[in-house]
From Swiss-Prot:
GO terms for biological process: AMP salvage. It catalyses: AMP + ATP = 2 ADP. This is Adenylate kinase. Keywords: ATP-binding, Cytoplasm, Kinase, Nucleotide biosynthesis, Nucleotide-binding, Transferase. Belongs to the adenylate kinase family. It is found in: Cytoplasm.
Amino acid sequence: MRIILLGAPGAGKGTQANFIMDKYGIPQISTGDMLRAAIKAGTELGKQAKAVIDAGQLVSDEIILGLIKERIAQDDCEKGFLLDGFPRTIPQADGLKEMGVDVDYVIEFDVADDVIVERMAGRRAHLPSGRTYHVVYNPPKVEGKDDVTGEDLVVRDDDKEETVRARLGVYHEQTAPLINYYGKEAEAGNTKYLKFDGTKQVAEVSADIEKALA
């Protein structure tokens, strides 16, 4: 099961990604994690990426696609994988297709901008693990503390309103066109496109996903 998640920052992708990973036993492939791992391991692509980053440039699609190709060839991706944060642009989606990566499902989480801004303000993060909570929608068992370690949760700079609105602007400009792109791919029978109402409760959205993927 090869899945791409689409949705604005704060639409609930991360929470549902964890659900899908646990439920179906497939790894989440995050381009950020992949880049860090390749740089740390000193692979050929990692060295190229490091040189670009050190020069203050953005890593090219070519390098990212190369990393994805290496990553999905690993044993844990045998049953499939979940792509989160990639593709972000039409050229990246084309690159994935040209590489021969078939996508079984494209899942979109639909949430209005104002709802996202309100949501982000309530987010709390456990930085060492990357686990995230929300004071209203997905509270920790103990207020302000991580469920697993009991350590303090923090509000990330990313979750402040002006930052959120700026990121939403970028999303609408760059990534929203992928909704049309994958809609057409689905019409052509190349993938299945699933759209979920991201304003519903976390458990409800998870149940909807499970039903759709059954």
